[in-house]
């Protein structure tokens, strides 16, 4: 088993995550941390080593997906004897619940046709985060984008979030905050698409898992807690812009036929206006 994560000026906040790994799996776990250009890399190395983790530099700020891909490369280069059947991809501000990795692996053993497995993700208040959702379509995406903030209960957002079923089920995609994936499948897919700097890289991956003939499965019996988006909290405006940029990239690829160019134009304009609206001072 290998656990891959990415840091960017994370500092001491990674300790709870590292401390939770041992209790999440009864099997040996190799932890690889790819750092995206932190100013405190030496301190991070010391923290990682104290928990038996391997810390490597990704070579720059490659975003979340690029950082995870760098961590997998480092796993091959630095720990060549580690040949895991599964990878747990996770944010560094996640605390893994007791036995959570074991529970995801058990689900994978029960469901050989499935490729990726997502736990139930709780926020700091203990509320379930909607981490297993349907793939966004144009109708759902536009409705969600237009009304999610002013009318949270709108039918498009409800369909997008698919929050009502905290039961084991298939989903279109799983949150990149924490999920288990078969190593062979992740390699087959070429890892994350690094053109998504941040946001929608998990949506894209979930779509490609489905296209490869595998399913994404929500496994709520495995529980983790997402303690907060540390690396994004310092620059919310930039992250909102990145979110809208990635949304356009995903939808423009989904509706890429040449005769849909007017639709892509409207999408770009609409998302640009929304980005300016939500980032206004």
Regions found by a protein language model. Give the residues of each.
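Short, acidic, metal-binding catalytic loop of nucleotide-sugar glycosyltransferases
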Residues: 19-28
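A conserved acidic beta->alpha catalytic loop
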Residues: 20, 33-44, 60
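Glycine-rich, basic loop-to-helix element that forms the pyrophosphate-binding segment
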Residues: 57-78
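Short beta-strand-to-loop acidic/aromatic patch adjacent to the donor-nucleotide binding site
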Residues: 80-95
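Conserved donor NDP-sugar-binding/catalytic core segment of glycosyltransferases
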Residues: 95-130
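Short, flexible, basic/aromatic active-site loop/helix in glycosyltransferases
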Residues: 136-171
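A short, conserved alpha-helix in the catalytic core of glycosyltransferases
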Residues: 164-166, 170-223
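Active-site-adjacent helix/loop segment of glycosyltransferases
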Residues: 207-281
């Amino acid at each position: 088993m290998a656990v891959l994560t990415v840091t960017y000026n994370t500092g001491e906040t990674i300790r709870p995550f590292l401390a939770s790994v041992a209790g999440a799996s009864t099997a040996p776990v190799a932890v690889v941390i790819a750092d995206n250009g932190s100013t405190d890399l030496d301190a991070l190395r010391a923290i990682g080593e104290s928990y038996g983790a391997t810390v490597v530099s990704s070579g720059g700020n490659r975003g979340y997906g690029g950082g995870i891909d760098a961590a997998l490369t480092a796993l091959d280069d630095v720990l060549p004897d580690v040949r895991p059947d599964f990878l747990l991809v996770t944010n560094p501000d996640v605390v893994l619940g007791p036995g959570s990795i074991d529970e995801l692996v058990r689900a994978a053993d029960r469901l050989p046709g499935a490729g990726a497995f997502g736990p139930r993700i709780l926020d700091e208040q203990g509320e379930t985060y909607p981490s297993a959702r349907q793939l966004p379509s144009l109708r759902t995406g536009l409705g969600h984008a237009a009304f999610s903030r002013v009318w949270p209960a709108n039918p498009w957002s409800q369909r997008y979030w698919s929050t009502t079923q905290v039961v084991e089920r298939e989903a279109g995609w799983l949150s990149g905050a924490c999920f288990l994936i078969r190593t062979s499948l992740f390699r087959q897919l070429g890892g994350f698409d690094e053109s998504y700097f941040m946001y929608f890289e998990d949506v894209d991956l979930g779509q490609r898992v489905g296209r490869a003939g595998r399913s994404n499965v929500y496994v709520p019996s495995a529980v983790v807690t997402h303690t907060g988006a540390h690396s994004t909290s310092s620059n919310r405006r930039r992250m909102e812009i990145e979110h809208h940029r990635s949304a356009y990239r995903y939808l423009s690829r989904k509706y890429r036929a040449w005769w849909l160019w007017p639709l892509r134009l409207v999408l770009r304009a609409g998302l640009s206006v929304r980005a300016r609206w939500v980032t206004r001072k």
